[in-house]
């Protein structure tokens, strides 16, 4: 008896095993992410075979993990094909999204001395401190580098740590880093040393020995792309293609609204009020509502009407390759900008997306806008953040200078 997965294909028999009840939802999940009929069918067949194998091995749904997927590929009679491994990864990701199986925990069965300490610290951050996954990802390599710097491949005795070890490591580590990364290093190191003292591995407060990274927030001038280069870049995009239509709208939003890349990629359909001509932005400090310039609105509408794939996602801008969904993070837009700059041959001061934000602020300053007005558009919470743009236009600054007492008028 055939088992119809959807209107387009069926399995030769009903699936069996712990994953059987998830076969149809898994197929729908794949279709929603833009996978074609052939790819969806192949992945569903792989999932059904995996489920049968799990049943034969007596493995329950809640016990499934990545190791089982690897064993199944080795046990199969059929020769592994390109895409088999990816199909099982997608299935496990889907099952985790349904809370059917636990999140995968990477286990090193023969960890080094350094790695044992890193893993214990990671468990502390996750279980005792309940820190976010991204924070743990940021802290782990710092601790690994610090322990390797001090102890190498030898035995680790945290009781031997001295303040000089801490300062030497920080000085060598942060000399090559920008301000943001340097602060992550010092914060992670303080966290680890506080943890070590809490455990009794060290008795001194070595966290206090971690140097403070100076924060000269106004020490550098923002590197802004010029207005002519923005026009040239936008003109170079082929808006007759779906990808070009999307890229044009996204880059125009960067340039005309001064949005952060994360704010562009997280825009949702409900954030745009077409009648009032307003757009809601999810900024660093909550939501901010801005007027929607006509050219930006027209570009977004053109993309939605002509080029956006049909998809259940509420994100405005979607990826062009499967899985079809919103961008996972701002790096996708950064790649679009870098490719566009390279294609056009524009020698911009930087290759990132923030140059458009700086460019808008500089143009507003030259046009007579106050720092308060610029900060409101950019979503700055404090005027000190916006004050850095006052260094950009010396001619504008000269008009603000007061005459010295007694100076000839």
UniProtKB/Swiss-Prot annotation:
<feature type="active site">
    <location>
        <position position="260"/>
    </location>
</feature>
<feature type="active site">
    <location>
        <position position="357"/>
    </location>
</feature>
<keyword id="KW-0614">Plasmid</keyword>
<dbReference type="Pfam" id="PF02899">
    <property type="entry name" value="Phage_int_SAM_1"/>
</dbReference>
<keyword id="KW-0233">DNA recombination</keyword>
<protein>
    <recommendedName>
        <fullName>Putative integrase/recombinase y4rA</fullName>
    </recommendedName>
</protein>
<feature type="domain" description="Core-binding (CB)">
    <location>
        <begin position="112"/>
        <end position="197"/>
    </location>
</feature>
<comment type="similarity">
    <text>Belongs to the 'phage' integrase family.</text>
</comment>
<keyword id="KW-1179">Viral genome integration</keyword>
<dbReference type="InterPro" id="IPR004107">
    <property type="entry name" value="Integrase_SAM-like_N"/>
</dbReference>
<dbReference type="GO" id="GO:0044826">
    <property type="term" value="P:viral genome integration into host DNA"/>
</dbReference>
<keyword id="KW-0814">Transposable element</keyword>
<dbReference type="InterPro" id="IPR044068">
    <property type="entry name" value="CB"/>
</dbReference>
<dbReference type="Pfam" id="PF00589">
    <property type="entry name" value="Phage_integrase"/>
</dbReference>
<feature type="active site" description="O-(3'-phospho-DNA)-tyrosine intermediate">
    <location>
        <position position="389"/>
    </location>
</feature>
<dbReference type="InterPro" id="IPR050090">
    <property type="entry name" value="Tyrosine_recombinase_XerCD"/>
</dbReference>
<feature type="active site">
    <location>
        <position position="380"/>
    </location>
</feature>
<keyword id="KW-0229">DNA integration</keyword>
<keyword id="KW-1160">Virus entry into host cell</keyword>
<feature type="domain" description="Tyr recombinase">
    <location>
        <begin position="220"/>
        <end position="402"/>
    </location>
</feature>
<feature type="active site">
    <location>
        <position position="354"/>
    </location>
</feature>
<dbReference type="InterPro" id="IPR013762">
    <property type="entry name" value="Integrase-like_cat_sf"/>
</dbReference>
<dbReference type="GO" id="GO:0003677">
    <property type="term" value="F:DNA binding"/>
</dbReference>
<dbReference type="GO" id="GO:0075713">
    <property type="term" value="P:establishment of integrated proviral latency"/>
</dbReference>
<dbReference type="GO" id="GO:0046718">
    <property type="term" value="P:symbiont entry into host cell"/>
</dbReference>
<dbReference type="InterPro" id="IPR011010">
    <property type="entry name" value="DNA_brk_join_enz"/>
</dbReference>
<feature type="active site">
    <location>
        <position position="284"/>
    </location>
</feature>
<keyword id="KW-0238">DNA-binding</keyword>
<dbReference type="GO" id="GO:0006310">
    <property type="term" value="P:DNA recombination"/>
</dbReference>
<dbReference type="GO" id="GO:0015074">
    <property type="term" value="P:DNA integration"/>
</dbReference>
<dbReference type="InterPro" id="IPR002104">
    <property type="entry name" value="Integrase_catalytic"/>
</dbReference>
<dbReference type="InterPro" id="IPR010998">
    <property type="entry name" value="Integrase_recombinase_N"/>
</dbReference>
